[in-house]
Amino acid sequence: MPAITCVWSDGRSDTWPNVNGHSRTRSVPSLKPLPHQDSKNLLYRQICGRLLAQHVFGGAGSTQPILNQLCKRLSTGNPNNTNASTVVTAPEKNVVSARHVRPNPKSSKDTLEKQPKYSSQIYLTDSFENYYLASLPTNYQLYQRDSNRENGNGKREFWLYGHPSGRPFRSVNDFLHHLYWLISDLTRNESTCCCVLCSGNMTRVRKNLQKENERMFHECKDDTYTWPSSYRLGEVVWIDINNELIPAIIVARNLINYESNQMDAVKLISDTFVEPYQYHCKQLGNSRYYFDMAAADIEPWSRHPLDLQKQEHLVAHSICQTWNLFGIFQPLEGIDMEEPKFHDENYSIPLTVLPTFGGESNSLDDHFYGIFRGAEKLWINDLCVISTSSLPSVLQKTSFMYISDIYVNEDDIVCFQGSLWTQIDKNALDYNDSADNIDEHKDDLKELPRRLQMVSKLSNTYFRCLHDKSVEYVCPFADVLGRWYEPWFVKGDLNYTSEVKERTSSRLSAVGSENWVDDDFYEYLLSEIDMVSAVVM
């Protein structure tokens, strides 16, 4: 069974109860420590591990099960060898879309019949059942508490001692919030923990804040690591409705999968797993219309020119003139941690620190989870295209930056920090080049985000870091041109622009009268779509 290890603890052994010579009476319950090997201790840790895995590797709409299934397929070398045990199949539903695939009109009838059809196969968290906590955090001890059963009102409980307050956690659910804080919040700031012992009468407020921060954590992980979506929540895009391109904004998405022709192995991998989302889009300039779209019917905003004679284009253009930062967090500097990753049995996830509580700060050197830049949304651990005009000659071949940090420096300038990479078409290399550089390419591939490993496997492309891996470059916000897209998502050239003029407090304030966020909308959305992920603004 895959184990989750808690590498840091705030536990104190001096808070444990003294049970030497202690016996149960009518008024005093008995306390018995349960050692690590005890079956009840293991059961307690299994419950903790299962719930914790849903927080760390799961999340509403998470694509982690899809990633697990694809890795199993690739490892066996047989893409058609599907492990269906992690998939819960729901009744098929049609996706409202102008068209999912643009078939060649010269294609035969047999070819067209092989085009994929969407269904609503929902991936749930069944795969988390086998997780367990390798051991309780250091200096935490589980006790079995038996109250007097002679009058028939007694009961058996399991209390966990070790919290600095000296009070015990009286249930697994109470301890889970503290355990999640121990593992995920590397700031070690107890004011951010929402367990009953740390937060006191602020428990409800902190839990609501944690819920929002956790949703942002999973959205970032899904967008940049687990299995990236083509488009992000809150982005302005073009949608194809009856062969007409209409400006729209993505307000929600839900996880889907569809059954394809099992004989077409390459197509099965690239279609089924590259784009696991359906997008819920709101037409800009007309608040009455929402569309459920497949990724093939959506294009990046930088793909087509504007017609400023049309009102809806003007509305979209005004939003794309704005930018805003969101999700303040504490960097890992100074944190004593050997390897900042969550570990699965077969995979490891980059450990992105949860955002700190509170709104936007006015202090300098703030670090941010992400940024809305014009039409697009960028995260840390993301890929962006930058202007090479200010780079030295040895870096002129830069194709994109792998973002490790977004922060405001002492001059109040937004900066992007990360490594610079180039992409090389394998067909463009001569025989000697490809032979000499193959080992270097393999080393670089290990350091890439999973999405680029996938691109390299499914296309004739190498990715290579242009500098020493211990060095990172800082790029000012003005030199960032936009997101880097996988080659199969872009149907032509992108017209990048660096023209963003107005800073706003949030995406909703930039949207203005086009705001769609209200209780009625999400109540309708949740009733219509399974496993929906609402926009984080």
From Swiss-Prot:
* GO BP, sorted A to Z: chromatin organization; pericentric heterochromatin formation; rDNA heterochromatin formation; silent mating-type cassette heterochromatin formation; subtelomeric heterochromatin formation
Q: Give the function comment from the record.
A: Required for deacetylation in the mating-type region and the centromere. Acts upstream of the histone deacetylases to promote transcriptional silencing. Required for proper positioning of nucleosomes at heterochromatic loci and for transcriptional gene silencing (TGS) function of the Snf2/Hdac-containing repressor complex (SHREC).
Residues of the signal sequence? none
From the Swiss-Prot or TrEMBL record, state where the protein is found: Nucleus; Chromosome, Centromere; Chromosome, Telomere
Quick one: a GO cellular component term? CENP-A containing chromatin
Which domain of life does the UniProt lineage start with?
Eukaryota
User: What is the protein name stated in its UniProt record?
Assistant: Cryptic loci regulator 2
Q: How does it assemble?
A: Interacts with clr3.
Region of interest called Disordered, as start-end residue ranges on this chain: 96-116
Any S-S bridges, and between which cysteines? none
What is the organism of origin for this protein? Schizosaccharomyces pombe (strain 972 / ATCC 24843) (Fission yeast)
Ranges annotated as biased composition (Basic and acidic residues): 107-116
Alphabetical keyword list: Centromere, Chromatin regulator, Chromosome, Nucleus, Repressor, Telomere, Transcription, Transcription regulation
